[in-house]
Swiss-Prot record:
The lineage of its organism: Bacteria, Pseudomonadati, Pseudomonadota, Gammaproteobacteria, Enterobacterales. Pfam families: Na_H_antiport_1. It comes from Yersinia pseudotuberculosis serotype O:1b (strain IP 31758). GO terms for molecular function: sodium:proton antiporter activity. This is Na(+)/H(+) antiporter NhaA. PANTHER family: NA(+)_H(+) ANTIPORTER NHAA, SODIUM ION/PROTON ANTIPORTER NHAA-RELATED. It is a multi-pass membrane protein. Belongs to the NhaA Na(+)/H(+) (TC 2.A.33) antiporter family. GO terms for biological process: regulation of pH.
């Protein structure tokens, strides 16, 4: 394993713990006398005005749409490296997380509809348990440090990216009231320019980031989830140049400390503050939250593991190197952490309806995601090899 990957794993082990602590602090603040301070912090208005461009959003949305685009940029860089020359290199290995992600979206949605399909209003939330919160899932996995094989972590990253792309498409098709075709057109032109730069072997990272910033603004203005820009830019930055430099690896190395120690903990703090005020036991056990929780905790692993197993047995795909099905199952449970992406879909699905629907949706998401995190972490501890000890070379 290269030095950069070793450092990457060390950073995430510490960063994962910080992320969990940040989430716990947010949950405590949202359900205490500090709730007002917590909400005021998230509502701080932040505006950027450059000529005719005017973007004004509360701090929460800058964190979710802006800082998280940087996180997805790093994820895109790593997944591209593994697809090109790592554990996912080759068509039969690359298709494996795609098939798993498909199962991980279908099964939770079907289970949710078993609970809520008869109700015309709650039926609209069918996509809520289809999402995976890549940041929280990665943070929980990172608690196990270097026990996690690189291939398994990359499988989670690739699966979660495909899952997120699927959810973004679902949001655009079913939950977006208005899409700006003009902004999407400019975004398409920016993507074409990035692809051309990659084809010509442009090695200046700053050039990709500048075009990527334009792409981010256009996707944000279009009404589609802006973090998609980060993944696209990550895939377009060259892995190697003709002079044997690696712009991709250099950028990944530079951004990782910021992502692990600042962006992800801040994201967790901003999104984990779910208020439990006014919650009743009867409401908590109603069909809406139970459908969501069951979809996340049961549907996710059922869909991911079943589709993965069938793909391998039918010869459609191959397991990543040094990975077994016990580990795949543990990761599939971890993918039941829907959290922020699920909350985002719930806010769209029940917009303009009874506020109680959104509240109990969030509680179902919290219940399912927390259960998936605890059980997924416990299973990973059982199925992963013992912690590797550092060897001093004299």
């Amino acid at each position: 394993m290269t030095n950069i990957i070793r450092q990457f794993l060390r950073q995430e082990a510490a960063g994962g713990l910080i992320l969990i602590i940040a989430a716990a602090i947010a949950l405590l603040m949202a359900n205490s006398a500090l709730q007002g301070i917590y909400q005021s912090f998230l509502d701080i208005p932040v505006s950027i005005k450059i000529a005719s461009l005017d973007i004004s959003k509360p701090l929460l949305l800058w964190i979710n749409d802006g800082l998280m685009a940087v996180f997805f940029l790093v994820v895109g860089l790593e997944v591209k490296r593994e697809l090109m020359e790592g554990s996912l290199a080759g068509r039969d290995k690359a298709v494996f997380p795609a098939i798993a992600a498909l199962g991980g979206m279908l099964a939770p949605a079907l289970i949710y509809l078993l609970f809520n399909g008869a109700d015309e209003v709650t039926r609209q939330g069918w996509a809520i348990p289809a999402a995976t919160d890549i940041a929280f899932a990665l943070g929980v996995m990172a608690l196990l440090g270097n026990r996690v094989p690189t291939g398994l972590k990359v499988f989670l990253l690739a699966l979660a990216i495909i899952d997120d792309l699927g959810v973004i498409i679902i949001i655009a098709l079913f939950y977006t009231q208005q899409v700006s075709l003009q902004s999407l057109g400019i975004a398409a032109a920016a993507i074409a320019l990035l692809a051309y730069m990659n084809w010509r072997g442009v090695g200046k990272t700053s050039a990709y980031l500048l075009v990527g910033l334009v792409l981010w603004v256009c996707i944000l203005k279009s009404g589609v989830h802006a973090t998609l820009a980060g993944v696209i830019v990550g895939f377009m930055i060259p892995l190697h140049t003709q002079d044997q430099r690696s712009p991709s690896e250099s950028l990944e190395h530079g951004l990782h400390p910021w992502v692990a120690y600042l962006i992800l903990p801040l994201f967790a703090f901003a999104n984990a503050g779910v208020s439990l005020q006014g919650v009743s036991l009867s409401g908590l056990t109603s069909l809406l939250p139970m459908g969501i929780a069951t979809g996340l905790f049961i549907g996710k692993p059922l869909g991911i593991f079943t589709f993965s197993w069938l793909a391998v047995k039918l010869g459609i795909a191959k397991l990543p190197d040094a990975i077994n099905f016990k580990q795949i199952f543990a990761v599939s449970v971890l993918c039941g952490i829907g959290f922020t992406m699920s909350i985002f879909i719930a806010s769209l699905a029940f917009e303009g309806t009874d506020i109680a629907l959104t509240t109990y949706s969030k509680l179902g998401i919290l219940l399912g995601s927390t259960t998936a995190a605890v059980v997924g972490y416990s299973l990973l501890r059982l199925v992963l090899p013992a912690r590797r000890k550092a060897v001093n070379v004299r």
